[in-house]
UniProtKB/Swiss-Prot annotation:
Its EC number is 2.7.8.26. The lineage of its organism: Archaea, Methanobacteriati, Methanobacteriota, Stenosarchaea group, Halobacteria. It is an enzyme of class 2 (transferase). GO terms for cellular component: plasma membrane. Keywords: Cell membrane, Cobalamin biosynthesis, Magnesium, Membrane, Transferase, Transmembrane, Transmembrane helix. It is a multi-pass membrane protein. It is found in: Cell membrane. Pfam families: CobS. It comes from the Archaea. This is Adenosylcobinamide-GDP ribazoletransferase. The keyword Transmembrane helix applies. It comes from Halobacterium salinarum (strain ATCC 700922 / JCM 11081 / NRC-1). The chain crosses the membrane at residues 2-22, 61-81.
Length: 199
């Protein structure tokens, strides 16, 4: 057990509490809005209209439940890792999630003025090498285990796929895309790190 015999469930709960206390829960709103938009039939403009609706739909509920379940099960897996490996996986996952958000800013455009345009308007694809240069060293955070490298790769890969899907769905990157990319990257990063450790 991690943390000197503390039960895995307690460690997982503490992880979730700290993550949401530090980063906030606004990213989950992006997940919810993306879930609602995903079930709308129509073009990107029709889907963006749903984002302004204050009613929570089944798509939002399903998306948030899946993400939170992914975080819970991923953090339970991390809690079973040796302490140094667990720390490496958590750090690499967070760096990967933020790297994915930076990639959204560098590679996507915003469909309208708002939070998304504040980021995409000030970033270019030319900034990606610097982003990668800052992120890559964290892959060594769990040496000799490659778990942190797996977490980083999983988070960044999931972020890229989510960015591509959501920007196509919504016709660009608004604030909800940034939030959803962050959360999906976090979930996949945790699981990827745990899976790599078991190999």
């Amino acid at each position: 057990m991690l943390a000197g015999g503390v039960p895995h469930g307690t460690v997982a709960f503490a992880y979730l509490a700290v993550v949401f206390a530090v980063t906030g829960i606004n990213h989950l709103d992006g997940v919810a809005d993306a879930g609602d938009a995903a079930v709308v039939h129509g073009d990107p403009a029709d889907r963006r209209t749903v984002l302004k609706d204050t009613t929570t739909g089944v798509g939002a509920i399903a998306a948030v439940v899946v993400v939170v379940a992914g975080l819970v099960t991923g953090s339970l897996g991390v809690a079973a890792l040796p302490t140094w490996t667990a720390v490496g996986v958590v750090v690499a996952t967070e760096v990967g999630a933020k790297t994915s958000m930076a990639a959204v800013a560098c590679l996507a455009h915003a469909p309208h003025d708002g939070l998304g345009s504040q980021f995409t308007g000030n970033a270019t694809p030319g900034a990606l090498p610097a982003v990668a240069g800052v992120a890559l060293p964290v892959a060594l955070a769990s040496v000799p285990s490659p778990a942190a490298a797996g977490a980083l790769a999983g988070a960044v890969g999931a972020g890229a796929l989510t960015r591509r899907w959501l920007t196509g769905l919504l016709g660009g990157a608004n604030g909800d895309v940034f939030g959803a990319v962050n959360e999906v990257s976090r979930v996949v990063g945790l699981h990827a790190g745990v899976v790599v450790w078991t190999l």
